[in-house]
Curated annotation (Swiss-Prot):
Belongs to the UppP family. This is Undecaprenyl-diphosphatase. It comes from Treponema denticola (strain ATCC 35405 / DSM 14222 / CIP 103919 / JCM 8153 / KCTC 15104). Keywords: Antibiotic resistance, Cell inner membrane, Cell membrane, Cell shape, Cell wall biogenesis/degradation, Hydrolase, Membrane, Peptidoglycan synthesis, Transmembrane, Transmembrane helix. InterPro entries: UppP. The keyword ATP-binding does not apply. HAMAP family: Undec_diphosphatase (MF_01006). One of its GO terms (biological process) is regulation of cell shape. It is found in: Cell inner membrane. It catalyses: di-trans,octa-cis-undecaprenyl diphosphate + H2O = di-trans,octa-cis-undecaprenyl phosphate + phosphate + H(+). It holds the Pfam family BacA.
Length: 269
């Protein structure tokens, strides 16, 4: 893998991991056109580490606050104002458990998915973003309930399918469940932390030759690219969520899905 390819793949990961356009779908398409259909396992793992670092950087204060609340709860010194944060922690645990079950059920199928299906899932993601942008609640919830957590965890599990955006599906699910926009965005990205960690652990365990096909400079270049692009992508997306503009990504995903469908089904065999 060249340094240029590493930077491009890192940028794609950084953009698509957070923007509601499906990182796995875009990486699969980029790898296909780069004629590199087996991404080196260590490179893939470290791209996830870089995007995890980006989300932890953006939400550093919030994460520290949640750990502080959890610490007080463990030593039985919780404060009355900790109630909402304790519910957030419980919601993350519930959602992650649901995600794990769905992810395990879909794991083998996702590994062998026909690349021609990915554009169809891009279109589905686009339609989901349009539908969620039309939601108008008279009174949107400011706090995550366990039911909302379970629904959002289900959506995140389905988001392992290439072409189905994890962030798009989780934010949309939270909105459908009645959560307000800012809280839906926050919950989605806090929920991504255990999901990315789990993916990291699974990939490490299943790896045979971590160093195959990639040089140290390519690894570093890809990681830096993924972190920088991911950081600014996440900041940008949080502003769009606040303003209810997620629907804009549908105007990219639907034409992309249609164009790739025509290519794969009509010209690529």
């Amino acid at each position: 893998m060249s340094i240029f390819q590493a930077i491009i793949l890192g940028a794609v990961q950084g953009l698509a991991e957070f923007l509601p356009i499906s990182s796995s779908g875009h990486l699969a398409i980029v790898e296909y056109f780069f004629k590199q259909e087996d991404l080196p396992i260590l490179f893939d793992i470290l791209l996830h580490v870089a995007t995890l670092a980006a989300v932890c950087t953006v939400f550093a204060k919030r994460i520290a606050g949640l750990f502080s609340v959890l610490g007080r709860f463990i030593i039985r010194k919780s404060k009355p104002e900790d109630k909402d944060d304790l519910m957030m922690i419980a919601a993350i645990i519930v959602a992650t458990a649901v995600t794990g079950v769905i992810g395990l059920l879909l794991k083998d199928w996702v590994k062998t998915i026909d690349i021609r299906l990915i554009p169809i899932f891009f279109i589905i993601t686009g339609l989901l973003l349009i539908a969620s942008s039309k939601i108008k609640h008279n009174k949107q919830a400011k706090n995550v309930t366990l039911l909302t957590a379970a629904i959002t965890g289900l959506a995140q599990g389905i988001g392992v399918i290439p072409g189905i955006s994890r962030s798009g599906s989780t934010i949309s699910a939270s909105l459908f469940a009645g959560l307000d926009r800012e809280k839906a965005g926050e919950f989605s990205f806090l929920l991504s932390i255990p999901a990315i960690l789990a993916a990291f652990i699974l990939e490490i365990k299943s790896a045979d030759n971590l160093l195959a096909g990639v040089s140290p400079i390519s690894l570093i270049s890809g990681m830096i690219s993924a972190f920088v692009v991911g950081y600014f992508s996440l900041r940008f997306l949080l502003k769009l969520i606040k303003n209810g503009k997620l629907m804009y990504f549908a105007f990219y995903l639907i034409p992309l899905g249609l164009g790739l469908s025509i290519y794969f089904w009509g010209f690529a065999g």
